[in-house]
């Protein structure tokens, strides 16, 4: 977790659509609570209908009594939620058909209505539509059912949307619940050997990856619970094209299991570098679930307010909505580097570079100590200035990997390129992406 730096905050997490979907995929306590809460929300809604729905009280009471008699789910009987909607519809079949016929009659009678009667009848049609839609608010959606049944989940998203936070937070939840889980950080894999071998080397295990999956399958079978494997940030593997060959092998092995699940994440623009053509199209892979992590896109205001409260920032919320605060990483960096003064992005970036210098030297202490450097030497700042000078000189908006390797900075400062670049990508000081014509 410490290696993720600002990409994971164990004590502070904001729920997103992606985190809800991941909960269903691994069948954790949050997913169980979400399903049971849907039933309670619907029961509360019945109490809010009031006198306007008096004519439909028989239908409402029948649905209420049926719901009350449906037991809450837990991990063992989770699949019962698959049947909640069908159970309700079966009990209400006669009454539902009667309501549908009543709605049809009302619609037919609208033809010869005056304005007042039309308004009243349209209100009744609206009430019937509300009642008929209620059964869809319990149990599981089709997508949630596919998440539960599928063994592989592919997550993509823009930089900083919270993919690492997503996996790390889920891993932390599993650990706190004494459940088995494996989180792998793809940025550790730095050579051209098979990725399965590199994974096992990083895990310090002297047997093959398939054997590790077999062990997890045995554990899951004994505990009767899923054991998820999360592989985060596939794009950060130094030779990330290796995943094209490795993923089909790994997915084939996972699909042979009953209790092991695999979830992977990467930046969207790397999709064609990482996935082979067969894996890219969801329509060709009904047994694989696909989601896009959009950060706080659907709850930006709630997230910003929570972040400002957490970091003690008192400025009015509206003042900050001009920034890209639907991106969790940017919001985190902003809050961590905010010092109570007037917002100033150049000043913010300077603070971020200073913080990156500290983190870089904490992550690679021997590299810097052996060369006599401290955080006050502003290594990150000097590297960024060197890159900017190259960009200005060459008239580009980016620097390619070959030119980055050839910068005079590396000889001048006597520092190794690969570990420093890897760390600066993790710090989001450098942003890499595949160049496409």
Regions found by a protein language model. Name each.
Residues 161-227:
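Post-nucleotide-binding-loop coupling segment downstream of the phosphate-binding loop, primarily
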Residues 2-58, 64-67, 83-145:
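N-terminal pre-Walker A segment at the start of P-loop NTPase domains
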Residues 218-244:
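Conserved P-loop NTPase "ATPase switch" module shared by AAA+ and STAND
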Residues 1-37, 43-65, 73-76, 157, ...:
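C-terminal leucine-rich, beta-strand-based interaction scaffolds used for sensing/assembly
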Residues 270, 278-317, 353-361:
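Conserved small helical "lid"/interfacial subdomain of P-loop NTPases
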Residues 153-179, 268-272, 276-280:
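P-loop NTPase Walker A phosphate-binding motif
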Residues 321-336:
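The conserved phosphate-sensing helix
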Residues 234-263, 278, 415, 419:
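Conserved Walker B catalytic segment
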